[in-house]
Amino acid sequence: MSVLGEYERHCDSINSDFGSESGGGGDSGPGPSAVPGPRAGGGAAEQEELHYIPIRVLGRGAFGEATLYRRTEDDSLVVWKEVDLTRLSEKERRDALNEIVILALLQHDNIIAYYNHFMDNTTLLIELEYCNGGNLYDKILRQKDKLFEEEMVVWYLFQIVSAVSCIHKAGILHRDIKTLNIFLTKANLIKLGDYGLAKKLNSEYSMAETLVGTPYYMSPELCQGVKYNFKSDIWAVGCVIFELLTLKRTFDATNPLNLCVKIVQGIRAMEVDSSQYSLELIQLVHACLDQDPEQRPAADALLDLPLLRTRRREMEEKVTLLNAPTKRPRSSTVTEAPIAVVTSRTSEVYVWGGGKSTPQKLDVIKSGCSARQVCAGNTHFAVVTVEKELYTWVNMQGGTKLHGQLGHGDKASYRQPKHVEKLQGKAIHQVSCGDDFTVCVTDEGQLYAFGSDYYGCMGVDKVSGPEVLEPMQLNFFLSNPVEQVSCGDNHVVVLTRNKEVYSWGCGEYGRLGLDSEEDYYTPQRVDVPKALIIVAVQCGCDGTFLLTQSGKVLACGLNEFNKLGLNQCMSGIINHEAYHEVPYTTSFTLAKQLSFYKIRTIAPGKTHTAAIDERGRLLTFGCNKCGQLGVGNYKKRLGINLLGGPLGGKQVIRVSCGDEFTIAATDDNHIFAWGNGGNGRLAMTPTERPHGSDICTSWPRPIFGSLHHVPDLSCRGWHTILIVEKVLNSKTIRSNSSGLSIGTVVQSSSPGGGIGGGGGGGGGGGGEEEDSQQESETPDPSGGFRGTMEADRGMEGLISPTEAVGNSCGASSSCPGWLRKELENAEFIPMPDSPAPLSAAFSQSEKDTLPYEELQGLKVASEVPPEPQRAAGAWPPRLDPAVPCVGKALTSAACACSALQVEVDRLQALVLKCLEEQQKLQQENLQMFTQLQKLNKKLEGGQQVGMHSRGTQTAKEEMEMDPKPDLDSESWCLLGTDSCRPSL
């Protein structure tokens, strides 16, 4: 890295939350790069907001807890490691900071990803990747003396060694590798975590000498108290693999002293079963556990062994594939400083229909087990939770026979949501219900199906019998991962990640889009024009829709009542309209009537269809017998209907269609229902008009009482299931706006304001520490959530413009304390009329923040007296390469003049860059001065209001002392006095 790059990195560290932890001394004034971002011209308005919803607490420790959050921007799960800094010692605070620094350096598929960090008052929040499979320690315990297959051990070994190789290449020694710190996803993807004890070594030959780590995994050199290096991590890797092979700790004892003796002497608790595992694998473990560190192989050497080398490419591709669904980019720069908005919500699942008009809340699906997707079938429901688990149960009335569509291994009718245990360890991404079967997709894009195979919907050519009672994987998609699945009553359509469409099952009316009405028992690829990019598939009862990236809609299957939108109305030359009906189509056909809109969501029902365009408008078409089109009447409609009325001006975000009714949710948290209201379909009893034995409504009517946000909604037959959320409270964490280090935060929270250990020095000096004490967040009466400092703090007064320029506040000034501290500690920057003297304004405090090499170069340059007539762009003078070298340089092969010239050019560019930064700071000072003037005017107006208020209060007190005689006691009470209130 160039010296200039190091300088920019140094500036970034000053701007970061923990810059003073690693920065220079506290005596130096704040340089240009140390100006807090949000206070310099309103930078906070440009900060990115990230929204989080807490799910549940994963675990608690001595100094904090780990909490699972859902990030709403991408619907991903993350872990917040919350550390209470007031309860940490100086060393523990350094460890917390160290973990952030180490994680920020590392990017590898087998290493816990670091996304961000925030500071909430005195709590450090580290946002990390979530591993939903627990840790390797628990995985070994769950084996219950049943040894792992060698293939699985090699798979784990490859991932662990790959992670260790990555951190060693970065010059980092982990120092705490153990099964508790090796995490797993449900797809058996390894993630190495917990870098609080990690240490950066300058080279592979560097040595560390601090006694850290877990005793069971300590190397002999650690036990003996001698220096150690990367080979100590290899020893720990050997202990972990030995544990995988034996399900027992490598070294075990009743006390630490005895344990160290056994480690140094190499007395292992037991030996690996050579009849179960290959000699090559056993020798690899023994090599890692060699008593001599020099004899242990490096991580890269382990990867080059034949045991791993022969399968390395295959396993690397597998790691990349498994990591793809959860991988997301980090923030592009450290200085972005995003704002975290944490919103606590209630999340509940309700069902109705089937004779129950009152929405029924499901107590099983709540709080830590909240839902992220729901689906209704004709006979059953399915729910995917935020932790990617699948629950199913029946919704039918009477004694209808089941066919295994619940996936519990039997045909029992479970009336309450039950976890599909057979999918334990699989992260379910999405589920879809057919008439009597279920199909789901995992995060890895693998497809599982269970239930009736009468029409071949299992996709295995009926080799598993007429019914499949447990989830069965479709090997057809092993090499072609699935992105989305949709089920009709008796057919299945999937969209792969390669944007290919496959369909199988019942082919009646051409619903499979295969240009025939044949049934297919295995997935068949659907021919789609190459110019079209399919982004979603949606099955109706007996038809299928494809949605393109440009918002076009393709449809096939039965077009009864024009529910596919394929009918066309044409005007002839004799001024009469011709209506062309398409009864059904066996290949995907463009729905021309929908081409006027860019469709984003489409929801087919039994007799009608609803769609949402890119502007949030709702479109309906199909049968209107029960008013299910929502147009205000029950007349036959031939074309596409754009809904107004109660939905006019609203943006619809969710819609679903049942047999003769429609449910929709809007962005202003309202839920509407219309159509056939019989048997509780609409969750109400409308009285608009009777229709036969049922009660219908043709206008969208609000239901469900108070306002609720609807993340997902599904209707099928006469049933509805939806997720509703309600905001409880919210808080904003402006972590990087304070610019506080760990040490400064802890000091500011101490009662006496004394100096705490470890963290005070750096960028802002003592003035910033005092500032942090005054800027503590205001506690909220409601309890846990607080507002930001700037929002809750009142303005006591404002400095005058003259005082602002002079950078002084007298004792009688109304300048607030926080502003006075900033002005007292700020660097005075002159305001020149021309940019020529800018080179002289390069302050000594700014130089002190530079890296050592630049600082030395600038000091040497400053010893040369400057020429007043020389412009800033002409300094320093260029060396003439034609001038011959003298002395020993004459005998050298290459003259050093060219290298010196490069160094001078680099320093010149560095100085010019600093001058540009100073110009920017001058502009920011002007903006701040303008803002101060505006605030001063507002303050004067506020003072006038205050004087008027005091005058009103005086008049009120006079009235209380001498009430008007023409008012009785009751009317006097209305004026707000206390004379009429009964004593307590």
From Swiss-Prot:
Residues 14-43, 744-790, 940-984 are annotated as: Disordered. The keyword Transferase applies. The modification Phosphoserine is found at S2, S13, S16, S20, S76, S331, S741, S808, S839, S949, S983. GO terms for cellular component: centrosome; cytoplasm; nucleus. Residues 732-896 are annotated as: Interaction with NEK6. The modification N-acetylserine is found at S2. It is found in: Cytoplasm; Nucleus. Pfam families: Pkinase, WD40_RLD. It comes from the Eukaryota. Keywords: Acetylation, ATP-binding, Cell cycle, Cell division, Coiled coil, Cytoplasm, Kinase, Magnesium, Metal-binding, Mitosis, Nucleotide-binding, Nucleus, Phosphoprotein, Repeat, Serine/threonine-protein kinase, Transferase. Its main location: cytoplasm. InterPro entries: Kinase-like_dom_sf (IPR011009), Nek9_STKc (IPR042767), Prot_kinase_dom (IPR000719), RCC1/BLIP-II (IPR009091), Reg_chr_condens (IPR000408), Ser/Thr_kinase_AS (IPR008271), STK_NEK (IPR051997). ATP binds at L58, G59, R60, G61, A62, F63, G64, E65, A66, K81. It catalyses: L-seryl-[protein] + ATP = O-phospho-L-seryl-[protein] + ADP + H(+); L-threonyl-[protein] + ATP = O-phospho-L-threonyl-[protein] + ADP + H(+). This is Serine/threonine-protein kinase Nek9. The gene is Nek9.
